[in-house]
């Protein structure tokens, strides 16, 4: 597991606005974890640890919350922050079972310079994300699509995407166009 995905956390037993302010004054962020049919867990996370890693997170980044005894597999559901001061007020995490496959939309990242575009063709992107199915820890943050070999008049379909091992398409029609060059 990448260390950049692991966040240390501690349980908290005090709640409410004044307690949240007290937590933030100690350079910690109040947070909750829900999902998996469990009760809501109230946590606090070190601000500096979260802020260092937060810029690298996407909607598909699976994080591991580690309290020293148990590791929870979570996604960030919501981050409440003051836009002017960049102070994070609160984080909501959604817990998933790391042993159960899930379906999630993943962005398609276009790379390379297409031969067809170099020849004067116009690239049209028809699909910016794709629904995939995998275990949470295998979920990619994006799917790369190399445009280098795509010629003028060609299309790339969902079935042409190169998916990481342990990841498969969850779309109904694999013959949908992702990009076309005309």
UniProtKB/Swiss-Prot annotation:
It comes from the Bacteria. Keywords: Ribonucleoprotein, Ribosomal protein, RNA-binding, rRNA-binding. One of its GO terms (molecular function) is 5S rRNA binding. InterPro entries: Rbsml_bL25/Gln-tRNA_synth_N (IPR020056), Ribosomal_bL25/Gln-tRNA_synth (IPR011035), Ribosomal_bL25_b-dom (IPR020057), Ribosomal_bL25_C (IPR037121), Ribosomal_bL25_long (IPR001021), Ribosomal_L25_dom (IPR029751), Ribosomal_uL5_bac-type (IPR020930). Pfam families: Ribosomal_L25p, Ribosomal_TL5_C. The keyword rRNA-binding applies. GO terms for biological process: translation. GO terms for cellular component: cytosolic large ribosomal subunit. Coiled coil: none annotated. Gene3D superfamilies: Ribosomal protein L25, beta domain, Ribosomal Protein L25, Chain P. Belongs to the bacterial ribosomal protein bL25 family. CTC subfamily. NCBIfam families: bL25_bact_ctc (TIGR00731), PRK05618.3-1 (NF004135). Part of the 50S ribosomal subunit; part of the 5S rRNA/L5/L18/L25 subcomplex. Contacts the 5S rRNA. Binds to the 5S rRNA independently of L5 and L18. This is one of the proteins that binds to the 5S RNA in the ribosome where it forms part of the central protuberance. This is Large ribosomal subunit protein bL25. It comes from Borrelia garinii subsp. bavariensis (strain ATCC BAA-2496 / DSM 23469 / PBi).
